[in-house]
A protein has these predicted regions:
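C-terminal, non-catalytic extensions of nucleic-acid polymerases
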Residues: 214-296, 328, 373-374, 381, ...
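Short beta-strand
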Residues: 135, 583-588
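Two-metal-ion RNase H-like nuclease active-site motif
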Residues: 14-25, 305-307
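Short active-site loop/helix that positions an aromatic residue
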Residues: 115-124, 211, 310-327, 598
């Protein structure tokens, strides 16, 4: 937001509102009696709960008094009152808002859903002159002001609290109620008491959760009232870090902001774009040897183990000296010949160091016998082209994302071969990358040649500033203290865990984003960012630089480096396991599932030694020793205790363990590709299927009981390639937006010949889900493996639930 509008995002209110709607899918016919193909979602009930702002600092489930407008109830002076109002249409709610005397903050859990109805009901769109409206996307409204509802600032409580109503209710001991979702109710139908109770309960849970946040989390960022609560959990973490830094490191904090603002290339659009194009998220991939064969899935019984890194991103943030791209020490190389010589020299230098696990390499490169820099190169970004690149071991897990690359114009000549979206081989492959990504490629791939048409490198490196190192150490210390049964409150543990989970996300937030507005009852992109050749990029980037010039604490390229370095750590462990005679089966960001061939204890011992080296190298670093010392002195904490807990950071821990924590293989495991696997741990089935409900694990367990068969047999029958889970059991929904003209909707009638009382919004409907292997993966397996039978691809089955009975057809 621009400086002139810095206070646009603060509404000072006397009361706080909580709003929720209940909807049905109503079938309508037109004036000639023809029924519309699709139903229109209609509000049949909505609830508003109002409470005095100051009450939120003290209210809880035991001292709240809910007073409904339609009931006579005496005031209990020992409790905090909130007032509950019900409406049968949105029009009634909007009229109610006009009776509010002051600007009112109104929390809505998952605001985007209610917002889709509100913008259809109103006519004049957003008030973006006087207030700041915040969107994360066209389907993700975080905060809004509507011209036709001038007294209300809508906020999304889900963005701040990060949990569903059910999770929040369970957490505070005030559970969500149940209701029959299959009923289709109209705004004129008589409702049961449970309908009102259900609608109201969701708002009360949100109210109590916001109150809990205000009482237990907000004080850590110096906030005492709801007006100034952050909009998102990420903003809360940034504020918490800011308060910590200003309290314990005021001078360094201010100096860091000045340095980043005046010195960093982060305000250069070209640098931002190459760093963004080099970004690599978590590596999610699998081994093609473990995909389905002609007997079904390639199931593993009691033979695979699972390890993951303890706080992978936080480890990188603490352990790494980041290449620092300052205006003084950064050098652009635009000449293709020089850039190519440079990238070849760097690749050779990096490869020399890959066997030395923790080496912080710096590489001295000469061109035509002349040294190109006064110091070693500490890092680079480059756009490169690999010639005849291929996976070193065809049966390894590939690690180059195909979506982040391009091939020659003649795609047939490029002979790009992919598996689960990852590159296996290509005649010619172009991509943007940094030094950490190049190192990972050198571990996994061979290539005949490499060319470079652009590079920017730096001879400077820095660890994160001490205020941030100490903040991370402190949050990790709190988190591990709770896990190790130290004297730590669960609320403090949850706070610390939330902070650690958000710290990486803070670093990689896009600097330029689409501009979003509302037009004709629809959320649209008014200015698009990031598309190729888009003139808006420069305009939006300049706005970002101007608006953030006084508050620069994070460097985007650091976030890119954190992600690629964490990915590199995964690739290095994958390499280590292969050298110890293991097959890596599946990996996801910070974890590896592998099968051992040979001496299991020898593999476990090698992982222990690997971990010991990680710990030694971490605690040996001068900036870590100093950060621990500073943190312990400022926070009055025992230094040995901090070191002991910090010694687990970045180490590989076993996920496959028994009830007592002893290492054991999974009961069974199978994968159909990235984010598609089924495992059983200690008799409990778990499934991860991107886009599909976790309920599939329950479905497998229920089917085993129903058919009186083992969990393994049930899993093999249900978790199969080309299986369709229909709408009765998938848990999958699709969202479509009402687009019918308002004047046309005014002419419609329902089955009782009653008119519509609302113009619709997001229509959410249950749908089926097909569990299958990616098409490029099918083709590859077909061509490479004789055992991959064609019938395995063509035959399918459908799983459904009818009257409580699971059926497989």
């Amino acid at each position: 937001m621009s400086n002139k509008n810095k206070n646009k995002n603060i509404v000072y209110s006397d009361e706080v509102a909580f709003f929720d709607i209940e909807t049905s899918k109503i079938k309508y016919h037109d004036e000639e009696g023809f029924e519309l193909k699709n139903p229109i979602p209609q509000v049949y009930l909505c609830n508003v709960v109002l409470i005095k702002k100051e009450y939120l600092n003290n209210v809880n489930k035991d001292n709240i008094q809910i007073i409904r407008e339609d009931k006579q109830e005496e005031i209990d002076d020992t409790k905090y009152q909130c007032y509950s109002y019900f409406f049968r249409t949105l029009e009634e709610f909007i009229n109610f808002t006009k009776t509010l005397k002051n600007k009112t903050i109104c929390y809505v859990h998952n605001l985007s859903y209610e917002f889709s109805f509100l913008i259809r009901e109103t006519n004049n769109g957003l008030d973006d002159i006087n207030y700041q409206n915040i969107f994360r996307g066209t389907n993700d409204c975080l905060k809004s002001f509507l011209n036709d509802i001038p007294n209300v600032e809508f906020r999304d409580s889900l963005a701040l609290l990060g949990k569903s109503i059910k999770e929040l209710g369970d957490e505070i001991g005030y559970p969500k109620l149940e209701i029959d979702y299959e009923r289709n109710l109209h705004y004129y139908d008589e409702l049961e008491d449970n309908d009102y109770d259900y609608n109201e309960r969701d708002n009360i849970i949100t109210l109590l959760s916001i109150a809990d946040f205000l009482q237990h989390k907000a004080p850590s960022i110096g906030i005492k009232n709801v007006d100034k609560l952050p909009i998102t959990s990420t903003r809360y973490v940034k504020n918490k870090r800011y308060k910590f830094a200003k309290k314990y490191f005021p001078k360094e904090f201010d100096e860091t902001a000045v340095d980043y603002r005046n010195d960093s290339l982060d305000d250069n659009l070209d640098f931002y774009e190459i760093s963004k194009n080099s970004f690599r998220g978590g590596l999610v991939s699998c081994n093609k040897l473990y995909m389905p064969n002609d007997n079904g899935n390639n199931w593993l019984e009691n033979s695979c183990y699972h390890i993951d890194i303890t706080s992978s991103y936080i480890y990188v943030m603490l352990n790494t000296k980041f290449p620092y791209y300052s205006k003084e020490k950064s050098v652009e190389v635009k000449d293709k010949n020089k850039a190519t010589i440079l990238i070849k020299s760097l690749a050779e230098g990096i490869e020399k160091y890959t066997s030395n696990y923790m080496n912080e390499y710096g590489i001295n490169v000469k061109i035509d016998g002349k040294k190109i820099a006064d110091e070693d190169i500490k890092g680079f970004y480059a756009h490169v082209t690999f010639k005849n690149i291929r996976l070193k071991n065809k049966n390894d897990i590939p690690s180059i994302d195909g979506a982040r690359t391009s091939v020659a114009d003649d795609k047939n000549s490029a002979k790009l071969k992919r598996f689960c979206g990852k590159v296996l081989e290509a005649d010619e492959l172009s991509m943007s990358l940094n030094d950490a990504t190049l190192e990972a490629i050198l571990i996994d791939y061979d290539f005949d040649d490499i060319e470079c048409d652009y590079m920017i490198y730096t001879t400077e490196s820095k660890q994160l500033p001490y205020f941030e190192l100490c903040f991370l150490i402190g949050e990790f210390f709190i988190k591990q203290s709770f896990k190790n049964n130290k004297n730590t409150k669960r609320s403090d543990y949850l706070l610390a865990k939330s902070c650690l989970n958000s710290m990486f996300g803070i670093k990689v937030q896009d600097l330029i984003k689409d501009k979003i507005t509302v037009k004709n009852g629809e959320v649209i992109v008014s200015e698009k960012a990031h598309s190729i050749g888009n003139d808006n990029n420069k305009k939006l980037f300049d706005e970002y630089v101007e608006n953030n010039k006084d508050n620069k604490q994070d460097i985007y390229s650091d976030g890119v480096y954190i992600a690629t370095k964490a990915r590199l750590n995964l690739v290095k462990m994958k390499k280590h396991l292969k050298e110890k005679g293991c097959n890596c089966i599946y990996c996801d960001t910070d974890s590896l599932i592998f099968e051992v061939f040979g001496d299991v204890e020898e593999v476990f011992n090698s992982i222990k030694k690997y971990n010991d080296k990680i710990t030694r190298e971490l605690l040996r670093k001068n900036w870590i020793k100093r950060a621990i010392k500073i943190y312990c002195e400022k926070l009055k904490v025992d230094e040995k205790e901090v070191k002991d807990l910090l010694s687990t950071l970045g180490t590989w821990d076993y996920e496959s363990v028994d009830e007592n924590g002893n290492i054991k293989p999974y009961d069974f495991f199978s994968t159909l590709g990235p984010k598609k696997y089924c495992k059983c741990k200690n008799g409990k089935v778990e499934t991860t299927i991107s886009g599909l409900s976790k309920k599939i694990a329950n479905l497998i367990e229920d089917y085993a009981k129903q058919e009186n068969i083992s969990l393994f047999e049930a899993a093999k029958l249900i978790f199969k390639n080309n299986t369709t889970f229909d709408e009765t059991c998938s848990g999958q929904t699709i969202v479509t937006q009402t687009t019918l003209d308002k004047k046309f909707i005014d002419t419609l009638r329902d089955e009782n010949n009653m008119p519509a009382k609302g113009y619709g919004g997001n229509l959410i409907e249950k749908t089926s889900f097909n569990l299958s292997i990616l098409s490029d993966t099918e083709s590859l397996l077909h061509s490479e493996f004789e055992f991959f039978a064609e019938k395995n691809m063509l035959t399918g089955q459908t799983v459904s639930i009818e009257k409580g009975i699971i059926k497989i057809i």
